[in-house]
Amino acid sequence: FNRWQHSIGQELLNETNAFDIRFLKTDMPETKTWPAIETSLGFQIGSARDELPLQYHVNAKFLKRAPKLIAVCTHGAGYDTVDAAACTEAGALICNQTGKNGEAVAEHALGMMLSLGKKILEADRRMRSDREWDRNQFMGQDMLGKTVGIVGLGNIGRRVAELCSQLFRMR
């Protein structure tokens, strides 16, 4: 649904001519999506519950409508949109795409922390709109030696903690 994580996946599958790949969008009418889903062997969806309409969450009801389905894959590490027990019962394999972008996400989180702490966006906007801006209003905070709170210490959370500790001697 909606996007490929990377175009190489579609390119490789198209090269084999062994697959009929159908790209669906969640805003398409169900008269277009369900005929494709009902005959599919594989189904790739987002992993965040709030990004996928409920009728496309893979659960027992969904699997009854898609009896040929043998594999479900989610974007990212999670599989909140997939009922693992229902898939097991139906014989459908579940896979996710964990870890591929973990370093990039951890670095992005660190960049956001720096941007917020140093008031970079606010200062940039003021500087562009007002030639007489007072830079003292945008001094920000140093990160060195501070205590950081991280919610969740999975792969990404642990990497953020490592970066904070190594780069800024944060606790």
Model-derived features: positions:
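N-terminal glycine-/charge-rich "phosphate-binding" loop or analogous flexible N-terminal tail
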Residues: 1-51
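Residues within well-ordered alpha-helices
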Residues: 8-12, 59, 83, 160
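Short secondary-structure boundary/capping segments
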Residues: 13, 34, 63, 85, ...
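Short, structured coil segments at secondary-structure junctions
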Residues: 15-17, 90, 168
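Hydrophobic beta-strand scaffold residues
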Residues: 20-23, 94, 171
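Short gly/ser/thr-rich secondary-structure transition/capping motifs
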Residues: 22-28, 52-55, 128-136
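Phosphate/diphosphate ligand-binding glycine-rich loop within oxidoreductases
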Residues: 41-125, 140, 144
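Rossmann-like dinucleotide/phosphate-binding beta-alpha-beta segment
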Residues: 136-171
